[in-house]
Regions:
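Beta-sheet ligand-binding and adhesion/scaffold domains
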Residues: 13-14, 52-94
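N-terminal helix-cap/turn-to-beta initiation motif at the start of protein domains
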Residues: 1-7, 24
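Residue-level signal for mature regions of secreted extracellular proteins and peptides
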Residues: 8-9, 48, 86
């Protein structure tokens, strides 16, 4: 998990506007209207990491698995949240 820590944006502009949209800290993923508390690691596919998670999105709480896909590109990662099947691409701030 240590290698994922940092600030991220949903656009590949290096967070030039001065504010990151997402931040991954030890045990926490925070973004717009989103706060996920990460728990125990779970089995994941090749190039992926997965964790049990409790995510609050707006006013709803979701329990499930948060998955990080690190295999797509070296300059980005993909993340999927509990209760969703869509992948969100995040780019590190520079």
């Amino acid at each position: 998990m240590e290698h994922l820590l940092g600030k991220y944006a949903t656009t590949d502009d290096g967070c030039r506007e001065g504010t990151a949209e997402f931040e991954i800290r030890r045990g926490i993923v925070e973004g717009p209207n989103l706060l996920c508390i990460l728990g125990a690691p779970k089995e994941a596919g090749p190039g992926q990491e997965a964790y049990e998670a409790k995510c609050t999105q707006k006013s709803q709480v979701h329990l499930g698995t948060i998955t990080f896909d690190l295999s797509a590109k070296p300059d980005s990662l993909k993340i999927t949240l509990p209760e969703t099947a869509d992948w969100l691409t995040l780019y590190p701030c520079k």
